[in-house]
Each structure stands twice: as C-alpha cells, then as structure tokens.
Amino acid sequence: PRAIDYYELITNNFGSNSTKTYSDKGYELPEVYDLRKVNLNNLKLIKYALHHEDNLDIKFFAPPIEEHVSYSITNFRSDYSENSPHIIVKTKTINSIIGEEDINEISLIKLDIEGAEIPVIYKMLKDKIYPYQIAVEFGDLMNKKFTKTLKFLKLFLFIIFRGYKLANFDRYPNFLFIKKNKFYNI
C-alpha cells in the first residue's frame, strides 16, 4: 500500500536536511524531515506483516474510504466482513527479523499494526526481547467491546510486570512504555 510508496519518497531524500515546515496535517512531505544521518543501513523497509507467527498469509482489508491509508487484519471498519477488498501479506516475527537483520538492540519499536499488536507484544516479551521503548496504538480499543478491553488490560499488566513503565498516554489509544532499568529518572 501507500507506506511502500512513501518509503520510496523518503529514500530519495536520504542525506538531506529539512527544507519545509512540518504541517501537522497527517501527511507530511519527506522534505520536512532532517534525513542527513539516514541511509539504507539505518532505515530499511521490511515488506512483511509483523505477527506472532512466521510464514502465514494474512488478509489485510482495505479501508472503506480510499483516502485513508491503514489496512487492517480485523476489518473493523466494514463490520468484520471477510468479503471486503484486501491484499495478502506474508508474516514475520520480531525474532525472525532480528536474526535476519543481525539486530543486537532495539531502542524503540513503534507498533501501529491494526489488530495484531497484542499477540505480537506478548510474543516479543515472552521471547525476552525488551526494546527500551514500546510505542503502540491499540486500535482494537476503538471498538469499545469488553473482550477487547479485557485483553488489553491483561497485556498492560504483562508489560508492567516485565519491567516497563507507562511514560505517555496523551492520545487514546496510543501508549508509550519505557523499560525502567534503561532510564535513570523514571
């Protein structure tokens, strides 16, 4: 989808300073970012769906409004219909990506993965992968179903008991967790 096209735009600006002002309207041109230290070695697009299992073929449902960009595995925007327009994407786990990309440490993981965030975080932490920061949007909380909220609360406690602190919660349902032993003043 559009994320791939946007990444291509960004790569054309690697090594460049920002030349435009940030608009805060949602879509930003690559020229608003300071990309002087960014290159293909430190910002790579991995064309797989992050998941808690490897090598699955998962349906990602198109948003009902074409201007919207986020595809979703839950299809909550179309009453969970299985017949909506979709694409098929192969999955990878964080473990697989870490191994393939030879990653030793994760400073920040940002997850806006439209319905897969809960099992992905469980698997990541159970596998003892502890990023310094976890920024996550819990999209399923938007549907206000009790079972979704309960799953979130269980995960929230799981994250806390794994040594994280909730550091920011200013735009529901976006959360920032920070690993306590990595930062001295929290």
Model-derived segments and their meaning:
Residues P1-I186:
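Phosphate/nucleotide-binding beta-alpha loop and adjacent structural elements of enzyme active sites
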